[in-house]
Amino acid sequence: MVSKMNNIQSSGEISQHKAAKIAGIIFPISIIILMVVNLTVVAPLIIKSNPSETARNISSHEFLFRIGIAGNILYSVCEVVFLIALYTILKNVNHSFAIFAAICFMINSFSWLLIAINQFTVIRLLNDIGFSHSFRPEGLFAMVRLHLIGEDIYYIGLLFWALGCTVISCLLLKSRYIPKSLSVFGIISSAWCAGCTFIFYIFPNYANVINLWWFDSPMVLFELAMSIWFLIKGIKTQQPEPA
């Protein structure tokens, strides 16, 4: 009986170590995908002050725009893999909180699917002759611009991402799977992101006080550092405290 219990525990530890390696690989990849497709592929096509020029850019570079859509979908898939890996690592620390964090990450992942769906709608609006006959050019361009406003969806997802990351950081602090200082930085940066995002919902001009890049950049740096630690150092499964 004791031998069987030891085998089960050993199997669980192996799963956690594998999950840590997966998390260490998948998050940096997902961030690279997200940054490349949105900052270097999609962003140059969108001119916020000129919807008609934006529509022409997308029509002329539809292949690039579709690469951006595919990248957002791939990022969403990577996020699901990442949250499963984190849940596997932390479920023995506190199952309920690990589930909550996974749900938060799932909502963030879903937000990127919504952005991708809106981008597909843009292509449909521009390519379907029926739409060009139903709307005046100004109206069609306005519809295109409306579906390209992914910031609102992003910042809704960001709040849940930050909440999930805050919980993850607390569980990592409790488990001591990573250095205490790194866990504390994760708690502070994630709570900061959640707070800034929520204030931004109510006071849009808050972005004039705190640059939007400062909302999530510290949290992303934490997750990158955590991922590198998982990949290089792994986790010490003998140390976590019972929930």
Task: Give the ranges of each region predicted by the language model.
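Hydrophobic, aromatic-enriched alpha-helical segments typical of multi-pass transmembrane helices
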Residues: 2-243
